[in-house]
């Protein structure tokens, strides 16, 4: 069921991105934002490269955070972290009680993903989680007319659009994700690079 709520200008949002894949353990960084204007906190944890622990690690990171009770939404940069460590967005929503918005710069190539998953003994399980994330929708935020692609759990389309427009103040990517990416790559590589 999609929750419908009033989107306040200073809604607390947690944006999560991963770092570069340098080791078996991959750092994930969460930034807590008030709307798209300012950062209130930073969370970090580690997931297994190509593992299946991303959902569980994110749930624990969020529930153990002092920010947990103030958070209203989780934003993810896609649903695969640390290689092919797939996040079950329905479970993330259910376990945290927080709606989940997935943001992607481009629409995934499911044929390539399906082909890559053949190299995993549990590829079918990962594929089911990917398909379970639901329909991918195209959204234009107003920033240069550049589209982004979204998936969602526990939140309606109108609120997703409001939140993305509120937080996409410097690019088509919402600030919580853009800044999480900068922090994660900066810590891992010594300098931030690439795009969220």
Curated annotation (Swiss-Prot):
One Pfam entry name: DUF99
TM stretches of this protein: none
Gene3D superfamilies named in the record: archaeoglobus fulgidus dsm 4304 superfamily
Entry-linked InterPro entries: Endo_dU
Similarity comment: Belongs to the UPF0215 family.
HAMAP family: UPF0215
Name the UniProt record assigns to this protein: UPF0215 protein MM_1007
Organism: Methanosarcina mazei (strain ATCC BAA-159 / DSM 3647 / Goe1 / Go1 / JCM 11833 / OCM 88) (Methanosarcina frisia)
């Amino acid at each position: 069921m999609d929750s419908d709520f009033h989107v306040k200008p200073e809604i607390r949002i947690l944006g999560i991105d991963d770092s570069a894949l340098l080791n078996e353990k991959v750092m994930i960084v969460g930034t807590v934002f008030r709307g798209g204007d300012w950062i209130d906190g930073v969370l970090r944890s580690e997931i297994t490269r190509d593992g299946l622990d991303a959902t569980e690690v994110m749930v624990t990171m969020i529930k153990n955070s002092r920010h947990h009770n103030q958070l209203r939404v989780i934003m993810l940069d896609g649903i695969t972290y640390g290689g092919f460590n797939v996040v079950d967005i329905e479970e993330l929503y259910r376990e945290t009680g927080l709606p989940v918005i997935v943001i992607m710069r481009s629409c995934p190539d499911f044929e390539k993903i399906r082909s890559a998953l053949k190299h995993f003994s549990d590829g079918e399980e990962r594929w089911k989680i990917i398909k379970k994330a639901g329909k991918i929708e195209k959204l234009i935020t107003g920033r240069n007319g550049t589209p982004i692609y979204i998936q969602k759990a526990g939140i309606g389309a109108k609120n997703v659009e409001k939140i993305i427009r509120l937080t996409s103040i410097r690019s088509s990517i919402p600030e919580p994700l853009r800044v999480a990416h900068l922090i994660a790559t900066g810590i891992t590589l010594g300098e931030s690079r690439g795009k969220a």
